[in-house]
């Protein structure tokens, strides 16, 4: 009986310990993403100074990568603001941005572009549903 009581005590602290580990890992990830975001800003400024032969696709790609870093950082901030909960809509924003980046980079095949556009349509539809009042518990 004594052993069973000790297991209950240990298992009651287990989720708390895992939550702390997750929080520390997300803080570290946020710091690393912030460093990469600043690196992307510096690289973007250097690309603007160069009036060379760089294609506009590379410049747009760097802007979209900046927004991907930014969205991940915002998602981590929202995680802590919303009592350790990731809002679904931020994952959808990241998915849409990633597909737009893919369209900018790989625009050779018309069939692939059509499939990417369909994927964006599905994600926007999911975003519309996720932003409805019925699904948004954070507005209450």
UniProtKB/Swiss-Prot annotation:
InterPro entries documented for this protein: P_starv_induced_PsiE (IPR009315), P_starv_induced_PsiE-like (IPR020948)
Keyword annotations of the record: Cell membrane, Membrane, Transmembrane, Transmembrane helix
Membrane-crossing residue ranges in chain numbering: 16-36, 57-77, 85-105, 110-130
GO biological process, one term: cellular response to phosphate starvation
One Pfam family it belongs to: PsiE
Disulfide bond entries: none
Membrane topology: Multi-pass membrane protein
Highest taxon above the source species: Bacteria
Keyword Cell membrane: yes
GO cellular component: plasma membrane
Primary location recorded for the protein, binned into one broad class: membrane
Presence of the UniProt keyword Hydrolase in the record: no
Signal sequence bounds: none
Subcellular location(s) of the protein: Cell membrane
NCBIfam families: PRK02833.1-3
HAMAP family (UniProt xref): PsiE
Entry's family note: Belongs to the PsiE family.
Record protein name field: Protein PsiE homolog
Organism whose genome encodes this protein: Bacillus cereus (strain ATCC 14579 / DSM 31 / CCUG 7414 / JCM 2152 / NBRC 15305 / NCIMB 9373 / NCTC 2599 / NRRL B-3711)
Gene, per the UniProt record: psiE
């Amino acid at each position: 009986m004594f052993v069973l009581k000790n297991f209950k005590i240990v298992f009651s602290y287990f989720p708390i310990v895992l939550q702390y580990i997750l929080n520390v890992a997300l803080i570290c990830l946020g710091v690393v993403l912030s460093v990469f975001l600043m690196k992307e800003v510096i690289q973007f400024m250097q690309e603007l100074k160069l009036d060379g032969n760089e294609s506009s696709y590379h410049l747009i790609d760097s802007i979209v990568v900046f927004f991907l870093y930014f969205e991940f950082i915002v998602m981590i901030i929202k995680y802590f603001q919303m009592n350790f909960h990731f809002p679904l809509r931020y994952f959808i924003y990241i998915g849409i941005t990633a597909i737009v980046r893919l369209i900018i980079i790989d625009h050779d095949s018309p069939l692939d572009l059509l499939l990417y556009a369909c994927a964006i349509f599905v994600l926007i539809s999911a975003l519309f549903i996720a932003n409805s009042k019925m699904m948004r518990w954070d507005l209450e």
